[in-house]
Every structure is written in C-alpha cells, then in structure tokens.
Amino acid sequence: MSKNTSDLSSHTPMMQQYWRLKNQHPDQLMFYRMGDFYEIFYEDAKKAAKLLDITLTARGQSAGQSIPMCGIPYHSLEGYLVKLVKLGESVVICEQIGDPATSKGPVERQVVRIITPGTVSDEALLDERRDNLIAAVLGDERLFGLSVLDITSGNFSVLEIKGWENLLAELERINPVELLIPDDWPKDLPAEKRRGTKRRAPWDFERDSALKSLCQQFSVQDLKGFGCETLTLAIGAAGCLLGYAKETQRTALPHLRSLRHERLDDTVVLDGASRRNLELDTNLAGGRDNTLQSVVDRCQTAMGSRLLTRWLNRPLRDLTVLQARQTSITCLLDGYRFEKLQPQLKEIGDIERILARIGLRNARPRDLARLRDALGALPQLQVAMTELDTPHLQQLAVTAGTYPELAALLEKAIIDNPPAIIRDGGVLKTGYDSELDELQSLSENAGQFLIDLEAREKARTGLANLKVGYNRVHGYFIELPSKQAESAPIDYQRRQTLKGAERFITPELKAFEDKALSAKSRALAREKMLYEALLEDLISQLAPLQDTAAALAELDVLSNLAERALNLDLNCPRFVSEPCMRIVQGRHPVVEQVLTTPFVANDLSLDDDTRMLVITGPNMGGKSTYMRQTALIVLLAHIGSFVPAASCELSLVDRIFTRIGSSDDLAGGRSTFMVEMSETANILHNATERSLVLMDEVGRGTSTFDGLSLAWAAAERLAHLRAYTLFATHYFELTVLPESEPLVTNVHLNATEHNERIVFLHHVLPGPASQSYGLAVAQLAGVPNDVITRAREHLSRLETTALPHETVVASPTKATSKPAAPHQSDMFASLPHPVLDELAKLDLDGLTPRKALEMLYALQVRI
C-alpha cells in the first residue's frame, strides 16, 4: 500500500482524500461512502472481496495505476458488518458529511464510526446471550494489570494477577474478543497467541494519563472510592481501554460510570483446562449443547442469561453473598412465587444493552420502543414482588423501581411499531411536537390543501374554469384560460404564459409553496433533532436505569434458579466451617438430562479423615462422570444455586482443578503426554488443602512403568497437600496407597458379566475394583471377535507367567504389599528370564563362598 501513498499529489483529488483518511487506519478495512454505496479500494478491496464473496473490479486509474475496488449498497451495510466482525475484522466507516450540490471538488468526508469485534454495540452484531468483552493487559512475568470492558453493558473492571499462568487462566475465563497489549512487549508471548490480540503504543498505557482520563470519565478526584488507587498496572490497562473505546465510538461514554476492583481471592479459581473439561458453557466440540449452562439456563431475558454465565465462570467464596442467594431462591420457591415473576420479566427484554446504545447515542427507534414497553411493565412486576420477604429480594425490588414519567414520555413520543432506523423518519407520534405535526401535515396533505384552495378561489372569483396545480419547474400555480385571465383578481401575480392559458400565484399560495416545498426535508430534520433530544433526556437518567437493569437481571437469574431447582429436583447445599465435602445421592446435572434411563446417583464423603478417593473400575463404568458431577455440584454451590443431590454439606473451596481427557497441542508443539504433565504440574504447584482436584488416568500417555511411577508420586503429593482429591486410575497398584497414606480411601465403580457381556451398574462402592473388564469394553466397542479371542489368549498367558510376588512399589516411607487381584496382573511383573530360573533352582546352603562368587560372575554375563 505504501507505493500508493508515497506521493499523494500524483493521485486524483478524490483518492488524495481517501488516502489521507486511510493512512490514519492502516490496519482496518475502510468503507468509503460514495452516493448510495460504500466503496472499498486497493488492498482492502482484495481482502473484503474474498471475505465477503463479492466481485472485485477496478475503478479507473490514479497515480498511473488501476484502482482495485469492490462495493456494497449502503442499506446492506449491517449484514456485511456481521460477517466481518465474526471473522475478527475491524471496519472504519467513512461518511459523506458535505453537500454534493455545494461542494467544490470531492464531497467532504470523515470517519464517523470504527467497528471492532470488542467495541460493537449494534444488536445485529452481537450474541445476545454472551458478553462481548475487550481486555487490556500491562506488566511483566511477575505481575500483570488486567482491565476488562463490556461496552454493551458498561461493566468495567480491573485486577492484578501474579504470573503468566494465572493471567492465561483469567483470559481463558473472560474470553475477550479483543486483547490490547503494549507494542514494546517481546514478540511470541503466550498472550499474543490469542485471536484478536492487538498491539498499542506504550504511551497508551501510561499510568498518569490513564489516571487523569479515568477520573474525568467518572467525575472524581481520585480512584480511592473504587478501591483500586494502588493498582498501578491495572490503572494503566484501564486507561488504554478507555482511550480505545473513545477512539472507536467517536462520542462520550456516559454509561461507563464506575470501575470495579476484582480479586482472585474472592473467587473459586478454575484454570483453562478445568473450564474446558467441565464444559461450563462450551462443550468440547465448541458448541453449546450438553453444557452446564444449557441445563441451568431458562432465564427470561438475555441480560439474565449473560449474568448467569458470569456467575458460572466466576464462582464466589463470599459466604454472605452465597447465603443471600440461597435464601432468595428458597423464598421464590415458596408458593411458586417465581411463576408470577417470570412472565413479567419476559416483558422487560434486554434493557441492559439498550441503555448502553442510548449512552453511545446510537440507539435505534425499536430500542426506545422496547424500553418504553419495559418501563411500562415495571409497575406490574413491582406488584408481583411485594410478596418477596427476604432482605436481598426486597433490595432488588427497591433498586428496580418504576419510572412513570419516563414511561409516559416514551409512550407519547414513539409510535407503536417504529421503523428500524431514524433515517427516513416516521418514528415520532402525532401530537408529540406541534411544529413537526405542521411540517408533516404540509408534506402529507398538500393535495388536500390545493383542492380546498381551488374551491375557495372559484367561489371568490366566480371563475369556474380556475385550476390549482404544480410542476417541478415553476412550482405551485393557479391556471386560468386566456379568455378569463383579464378577470383575475388584483392579488393574482402572473407566473407563466402558455398557449391558451395564463398561470398565476397569490400571496397565500406562495406562502404555502415556501412551506410545502421544504416541509419534507424540514420535517425529517426536525424529527431527527427531536429524537436526539429524546436520547439526551434518557441519558440524563442513565445511572438509575442501569441500576434497574442490573437488579432485574439478578432477579431473573434467581427466579431461573428457583425454577430449575423445582424441575430438576435440586436441593440447597449447606456451607459449614469445618473442612468437608459430603454429598448424598449426587447426580451429574447434564448427563442426567440426556439419558433415556434413570441416572444412578452416588454418595461422596471427604473430610479430615479422608482427603483422597482412589477410584478404580472399568472403562465406561462411570468414573469420569462421578468425578465431574462432584466438581459441578461444588461449583453450583459456589454460585448460590441449589445442587443435584439429596443433600450436600461442604466448606468453601479455593480452586477446582481437573486433569481429565487427552488431547495434544499441535499449535504449541506439545504431545498428549506433555499436555497431561503440564496440567499435572500446574495442579501440584497450586493446589491447597481447600482445593478440589480431579485426576483421571494420570500417566497413561507414556510407558507403563513411567506412567505408574508418576501417577503414584502425584497421588502421594496430593495426599500430603491434603487437597480434596478424586484420583481415577487403571493402575491397580495404586490401591495399596491407603496402607501408607491414612487420608486415602479406595472406592470403585461396579460392573458384572452376564452371558459373556458386561453390565455397568455405575454404583460407587468401597474398596478397589476386582477386574478391569478391558476386553469386555473392547468387545462393546466393536473390536473384531478374532482379535478379542486372541487377546484373551495373551491375557491368560500373561496372568499365568507373570512373576508372582507380593511386594510391589515401596513408598518413600513404607514398603507395601497387597494380594494379587483376580484376573489383574501386576503392572510391574516381568516375564520369566533364564537367569531367574537358575537362581530359583540354586541350593544356596550347598554352595561354598568361592562357588557362589563364580556363579554370580557367570550369571552376570548372561543378563
């Protein structure tokens, strides 16, 4: 592109104007308004044509070269923007602001909007059920400042995080569509691998200027009131975000009213692997089906669904908040009160995002119509909320409030079914503004005026052949036949002479003409001005309206959780101070919904006497389901929800870790085993005695001996850490752990064989499993029968020839032993060796020392 911009004087005047604007936005697609089209030029055109599947053509020449070009109709803009934003592209909208009729040279143009994935607010460009977040990060490997903004709601937060590992986990949680990092950071950092990462000038993150702009935004002298005045790095990141938002929106941001200081210590932390494994809101295939959210989300509003997603992705450790939510759900269940609220909440709609668009001054007429309907529904909702008698619900009712004056204003202003955009008018009701009514009447009723005028003039003049008409050249006129022209009244002024007729105009008709000819454009301008004024009236009340939206979203979530508790048979968990995790008849909330047979519920008990369960049993026996359901029950408890269990008693946890499943990281150059060990290392470094740890088949990605050794050592470390641990394994040798680790207990998932086929019973029972049923599972999977038969032969030989011994692997503190399990050969058993056979036959009592030494030398050579 540089070759086209090296000398602007060589370009045509229009392309000079284009390049002056384009050079300010080199990395973004520019849509350049020309008449009824947005034109796209040069490299932008080539890229856009490919992404949008539109025709690439050429437009004349400039600077001696043809100009690659493609274009789209201006009225189709939104559809194309949707495609580009979903592809992660940013688009600059350049509009004509000058009047082509009066412009000398190219019509004046300027950039009016910049659409980026993280700063879009248009309804068509957003997923209504998910937050659309943009983040900025500043710092080094030891400490990072992170700021997160949702421009579609006004939520703006900061936090500081120690180390890359925790930063990447937090980025995985919030999943921003754009991430801003300083341009002076080294290349190929972990954060830069994320899609949507953009580098910004280092001075955009400068702390002092950031502090100044943030204080100006919130109309405060300092940030002490937000509790984040000492977060130097996070303030720098927040300043960068605020500047970026203003740059893209080209307007003030009144809906950004505060800065929330978040702390990781206040939450239950889940790393990226754990979030993926538990499938909270995205399944392992990248979809939304069969996720926890798909089961627990029946919210009536989109803003309620988004809030529930935030809760699921950020479980709390604040017992006061959790118990307030539990009490609220109990109240809503009492007498099925939630059933009265939910239909009313459905009438509210997504006012959170509507208010953001009002703040950005790009709200559309239908946004205001929906806000009108929402405010109109508030009084009836308040009636339904009078029965709610918990302090938290009562506070939500007070915050929700009512807005009778604002509702009346919108009812008076906006027609029942307004058009999508204000561009062509037709939005405001008759009676809202007398001047607008007059202008619209002139424009719409000109024909009737002319009919009435003609009748009056005929009566006044007595000239029966008088006609009133209009043409584009001479405007409005009164026409008389030539023979009657001499009888025209004195106030008739001659306008045009025709063959056989004369045309006149009167002062009254002239006054009407002046009004009528400009009435339509003046009416449209007046309506747009009134619409902007209406937005300003709404902006003046934005703060309480946003509080109302937040209260209604939470009420929606709590009502939803009450409905789910009733229909999914969920019960209220009890938080206790002593360390424990006791679940009676726990169920997996997602698996239970997709099964066509009844789900087999199971108990779990972890406390000061038992901190680890070693779980054995066949593949498909339910080990992973049992582990995951425990994590989901604990997570639901920590958002204040009821849980899928007959009863649940637990203490607060600080983290949930999962090491489940196997997959490689081709992009990162890591094998399946490397991924497994990285996740294991993260757990061993960061788990505490208040963490819940799920470990599934650790060590299976390498050789038997290496894998077993690593699994054994990892289990010992977790036992010493006293973390709440569920350790599923096929290494039966690990079932001896309780003999050396008093906090470890064996359990297994049972199964049985019937008519040579395996039947999974899915019950969790005490003690280790007696069989692995590996061949039976292989048969179920469709492995050919001859392969199964041959495998049975190999298994029989291995079981009969494996070296019998009692001692397996000694722990660092104590040698352990266990009796051989039926049909399960020891993983450390080796096949017979001739040297071992001879050693077994030696008569040690009959050997002299010299003979014994000679025998050892001979045997050593043969090993």
Curated annotation (Swiss-Prot):
Family from the record: Belongs to the DNA mismatch repair MutS family.
InterPro entries, A to Z: DNA_mismatch_repair_MutS, DNA_mismatch_repair_MutS-lik_N, DNA_mismatch_repair_MutS/MSH, DNA_mismatch_repair_MutS_C, DNA_mismatch_repair_MutS_clamp, DNA_mismatch_repair_MutS_core, DNA_mismatch_repair_MutS_N, DNA_mismatch_repair_MutS_sf
Pfam families: MutS_I (PF01624), MutS_II (PF05188), MutS_III (PF05192), MutS_IV (PF05190), MutS_V (PF00488)
CDD domains: ABC_MutS1
A Gene Ontology molecular function term of the record: damaged DNA binding
GO biological process: mismatch repair
Native source species: Pseudomonas fluorescens (strain SBW25)
Protein name: DNA mismatch repair protein MutS
Keyword ATP-binding: yes
Its biological purpose: This protein is involved in the repair of mismatches in DNA. It is possible that it carries out the mismatch recognition step. This protein has a weak ATPase activity.
Binding residue positions for ATP: 617-624
Classification via SMART domains: MUTSac, MUTSd
GO cellular component: cytosol
Keyword terms, alphabetized: ATP-binding, DNA damage, DNA repair, DNA-binding, Nucleotide-binding
Matching PROSITE patterns: DNA_MISMATCH_REPAIR_2
